[in-house]
C-alpha cells in the first residue's frame, strides 16, 4: 500500500499527550502540610551506638584452604588483575594475571574474605591471610 492510503484515515481520537489536570491553589498547600505532619515536635533521640568488634567465637570449620576455595580465589583475583585492579605485590617481570594472583596468595596479600556456610544456615568468615595453604598446593603456587 502506498502512503497516500494512510492519509485518508481519520484521527481515532488519541491525543499525543494527556491533558494535565488543573490543580487548585489551596490543595497544593494541603499536600505540603500533610507531608510534614509526621515531623512535628522534637527529633527523637537515638542511642549512641558504639561500634564493637565482632565477637570471636570458636570456629567450627577447618583452618586449611580447600582446593575449591583456592581455585575460586585465584580465578577471581586473576580476573580483577586482568581488568587493571591494583596489584598488591611487587612485580618482577610477571605479566600473567594468574601468576600475579599466585604470588599474592603466596605472600598472603589477597584482600578477600571467604564465607563458609554451615548446615544450620549460619556461616563463618575467614580472611585469606588466616587460612593455611597446604604444602602440596604451595608447590603449585611456588611457596617454600
UniProtKB/Swiss-Prot annotation:
Q: Where is the composition biased (Acidic residues)?
A: 1-32
Gene3D superfamilies linked = 3.90.940.10
State the GO CC annotations: RNA polymerase II, core complex; RNA polymerase IV complex; RNA polymerase V complex
**Compartmental location:** Nucleus
Q: Which GO terms describe its biological process?
A: DNA-templated transcription
Q: Where is this region: Disordered?
A: 1-62
A Gene Ontology molecular function term of the record: DNA binding
* Major localisation: nucleus
Where in the sequence does UniProt note compositional bias of the Basic and acidic residues kind?
A: 46-56
Disulfide topology: none
UniProt keyword list? DNA-directed RNA polymerase, Nucleus, Transcription
Q: How does it assemble?
A: Component of the RNA polymerase II, IV and V complexes. Interacts with NRPD1.
The UniProt family comment states: Belongs to the archaeal Rpo6/eukaryotic RPB6 RNA polymerase subunit family.
- Task of the protein: DNA-dependent RNA polymerase catalyzes the transcription of DNA into RNA using the four ribonucleoside triphosphates as substrates. Component of RNA polymerase II which synthesizes mRNA precursors and many functional non-coding RNAs. Pol II is the central component of the basal RNA polymerase II transcription machinery. It is composed of mobile elements that move relative to each other.
The name of this protein is DNA-directed RNA polymerases II, IV and V subunit 6A
- The species this protein was found in: Arabidopsis thaliana (Mouse-ear cress)
Amino acid at each position: 500500500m502506498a502512503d497516500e492510503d494512510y492519509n485518508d484515515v481519520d484521527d481515532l481520537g488519541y491525543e499525543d499527550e494527556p491533558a494535565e489536570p488543573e490543580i487548585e491553589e489551596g490543595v497544593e498547600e494541603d499536600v505540603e502540610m500533610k507531608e510534614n505532619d509526621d515531623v512535628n515536635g522534637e527529633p527523637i533521640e537515638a542511642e549512641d551506638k558504639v561500634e564493637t568488634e565482632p565477637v570471636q567465637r570458636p570456629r567450627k570449620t577447618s583452618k586449611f584452604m580447600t582446593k575449591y576455595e583456592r581455585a575460586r580465589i585465584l580465578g577471581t583475583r586473576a580476573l580483577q588483575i586482568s581488568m587493571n585492579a591494583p596489584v598488591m605485590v611487587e612485580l618482577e617481570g610477571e605479566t600473567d594475571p594468574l601468576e600475579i594472583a599466585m604470588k599474592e596468595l603466596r605472600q598472603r596479600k589477597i584482600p578477600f574474605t571467604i564465607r563458609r556456610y554451615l548446615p544450620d544456615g549460619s556461616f563463618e568468615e575467614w580472611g585469606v591471610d588466616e587460612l593455611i595453604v597446604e604444602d602440596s598446593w604451595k608447590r603449585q603456587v611456588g611457596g617454600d
